A protein has these predicted regions:
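Conserved ABC ATPase "signature" region
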Residues: 109-126, 177-178
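ABC-type ATPase nucleotide-binding domains, specifically the catalytic core motifs of the NBD
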Residues: 53, 73, 92-111, 120
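Catalytic Walker B motif of ABC-type/P-loop ATPase nucleotide-binding domains
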Residues: 155-159
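ABC ATPase NBD coupling module
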Residues: 67-84, 104
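Conserved ABC ATPase signature
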Residues: 130-134, 138
Length: 210
């Protein structure tokens, strides 16, 4: 399985953010996308998952495992996304946040998946807690696991470590990369930080907009 992105152009008004770009994120690989602010990195992720703002125009193709996604609604693309802000639901417990993402099925099975997720997060016993009581690193880990519990076929990471201090950033980077690789899905990471690059053999740098 791979995520293929072929961009003819990505524009906002008369400004071309991205032109003639092709990249492929392979299964089990974290492909890193870098570029200056305003180069279209986050907008490209929005185009991939189907949430591009009306002010932007995307011309190109997005395919996952050979299936074109361009005309599918966001919910049918099966692509997860993790932002720099964890965006946990404040009115839900940690357990409820995780359960929200689990696909429909027998309740006992869904609950078992949540308990296993809490174990994998090294947060057993945290299920009943309010997300506001968690540390920044714990919240980020819960947000990642929530994205993965939805069983995405690919995952987009939009500056997920940018608000963390150096020590936490390093630990979270290792945790995220190990976790997504174990799921064997293609991953596209947007970052400004050279230290976030997962593998320089899978790196795309965007030029400045024209």
């Amino acid at each position: 399985m791979s995520l293929m992105i072929d961009v003819e152009s990505l524009k906002v008004g008369a400004t071309t953010l991205i032109h003639a770009l092709q990249l492929e994120a392979h299964r089990g690989v974290v492909h890193t996308l870098m570029g200056a602010s305003g180069s279209g990195k986050s907008s490209l992720l929005a185009a991939v998952c189907g949430t591009l703002a009306p002010a932007l125009e995307f011309n190109g193709r997005v395919a996952l495992d050979g299936e074109l996604l361009d005309h599918l609604p966001t919910e049918r693309r099966r692509i997860g996304i993790l932002f720099q802000d964890d965006l946990l639901f404040a009115h839900m417990t940690v357990r409820e946040n995780l359960l929200f993402a689990v696909p429909p099925g027998p309740r006992a099975q869904r609950e078992a998946l949540v308990q296993q997720a809490l174990h994998d997060l090294e947060l057993p016993g945290f299920g009943k807690q309010d997300p506001a009581t968690l540390s920044g690193g714990q919240r980020s880990r819960v947000a990642l696991m929530r994205a993965l519990l939805a069983q995405p076929k690919a995952l987009l990471l939009d500056e997920p470590f940018s608000r963390m201090d150096a020590g936490l950033r390093s630990r979270m980077r290792d945790f995220v990369f190990a976790t997504v690789r174990s799921r064997d899905i293609p991953v596209l990471l947007v970052t400004h930080d050279e230290e976030d690059i997962a593998d320089r053999a899978h790196l795309t740098r965007l030029p400045a907009p024209v």
